[in-house]
């Protein structure tokens, strides 16, 4: 049955208009969530579809949702596909920050968490876009908070030892922003980093204390 459904969905999606394409992509993502690892034989075909449709801006959100579903279904088996899809996901963070792009970026952050430890070797590429997102003043509170909590979530999946400084200093700068929701997200994330880094976190404590006393007293 699956052998018939996946090719059929791919064919119909290619030949439909953009509105129907979005619906079909959502259905494929749901199907992947049902059949889970049994989708493995169709992954190359699905990625062909993703690559073919990626440049259609209105489809990027459902395409990221589809990629996230694949990452969740395949778990460790998803690792070989990351080099081909990650550049596309990172490119979502370029250009003007529209409402649609913001929603897609948030979905990419959720996908990063789904990829889990598979993404660890690409942290040097992933961390800059996360940091940029939680620091950017034109970003929505939801986008910035999601970026911050993505660091918290990833801290349970990957080793941040080599990236602590480039993560923590920007987080501390966010504490100066007059928004309690962001500040609480930062504090929760810093606590998660303390848990992972242990004594290596001590070097950052004076700076955190100074900023906390200045802006959160």
Regions found by a protein language model. Give the residues of each.
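Hydrophobic residues within the alpha-helices of tandem HEAT/HEAT-like
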Residues: 9-13, 24-35, 53-54, 63-75, ...
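HEAT/HEAT-like alpha-solenoid repeats
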Residues: 3-14, 18, 33, 44-55, ...
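Core helices of alpha-solenoid repeat scaffolds
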Residues: 1-7, 28, 39-48, 63, ...
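Alpha-helical structural elements of signaling/regulatory helical domains
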Residues: 19, 38, 55, 59, ...
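Residue-level detector of extended alpha-helical repeat arrays and alpha-solenoid scaffolds
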Residues: 21, 60, 101-105, 140, ...
């Amino acid at each position: 049955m699956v052998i018939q459904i996946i090719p059929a969905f791919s064919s119909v999606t290619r030949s439909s208009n953009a509105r129907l394409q979005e619906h079909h992509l959502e259905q494929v993502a749901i199907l992947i969530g049902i059949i889970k690892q049994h989708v493995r034989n169709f992954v190359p075909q699905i990625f062909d579809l993703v690559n073919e449709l990626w440049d259609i801006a209105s489809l990027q959100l459902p395409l990221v949702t589809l990629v996230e579903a694949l990452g969740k279904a395949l778990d460790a088996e998803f690792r070989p596909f990351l080099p081909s899809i990650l550049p596309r996901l990172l490119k979502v963070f370029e250009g003007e920050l529209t409402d649609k792009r913001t929603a897609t970026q948030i979905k990419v952050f959720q996908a990063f968490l789904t990829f889990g430890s598979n993404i660890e070797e690409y942290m040097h590429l992933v961390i800059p876009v996360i940091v940029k997102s939680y620091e950017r003043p034109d970003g929505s509170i939801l986008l910035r908070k999601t970026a911050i909590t993505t660091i918290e979530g990833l801290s349970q999946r990957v080793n941040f030892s080599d990236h602590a400084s480039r993560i923590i200093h920007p987080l501390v700068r966010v504490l100066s922003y007059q928004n309690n929701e962001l500040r609480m997200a930062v504090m929760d994330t810093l606590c998660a980093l303390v848990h992972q880094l242990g004594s290596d976190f001590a070097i950052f404590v004076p700076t955190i204390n100074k900023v906390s006393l200045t802006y959160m007293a």
